[in-house]
Amino acid sequence: KTHMHSNINMENQKSKIKENMSNITNKVVIMSGKGGVGKSTLSVNLAYGLSMRGYKVGILDADLHGPNIPIMLGVEGEKLTDLSVPYKINENLCTTSLSFFLPSTDPIIWRGPQKMGAIMEILENVVWGKLDYLIIDLPPGTGDETLTIAQNVGVGTKAIVVTTPQDVAL
């Protein structure tokens, strides 16, 4: 019975995620093979550029270990009480990050299921509304967060892979 209940909850969650993603015209994941190559910088600059052109843009900070988007947007330390409402930066730009809901700036030390659960909760509960673009800033590599996003955000998602010319970054 528990297994069946678990499957029903998962199907409900996936249905809600699909519904949330259906109002977003373009989904773009920003990824890399290693850290420190400029993913978050590109995510913020791309989002700002699109929003300045009049597009409605959201940034999802999916890097649970190093959530830099709030820092780069100048909203570090802001605390939200409602997971479903993204933080409004300006008329056309909003963001959400797990760091808005954590009690401190201590690093997160979570195993795969905890990370996947947090990502799924964000995807399920954040109500972006109608967006032209959702920019998803991923952590480095192809770990649990990246796989969870890839499996749940939907068909037609575009990817930008950021790298530097060093062998270790390729």
State where each predicted segment sits.
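Extreme N-terminal, non-catalytic leader segments
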Residues: K1-V37, E78
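Conserved, well-folded catalytic cores of nucleic-acid-processing
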Residues: K27, M31, R53, M72-E76, ...
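Walker A/P-loop phosphate-binding motif and the immediately C-terminal alpha-helix
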Residues: K27-L64
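Short, ordered loop/turn segments at secondary-structure junctions
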Residues: G35, A62-L64, F100-F101, P140-G141, ...
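Short glycine/serine/threonine-rich phosphate/pyrophosphate-binding segments
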Residues: K39-N45, G66-P70, G141-T146, A169-L170
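Predominant activation on well-ordered alpha-helical scaffold segments within soluble catalytic domains
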Residues: V44-A47, S51, P70, M116, ...
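Phosphate-binding loop that captures ATP/GTP phosphates
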Residues: K56-G58, A62-I109, M116-E121
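Conserved catalytic-core segment of NTP-binding enzymes
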Residues: N125-W128, D132-Y133, P139-L170
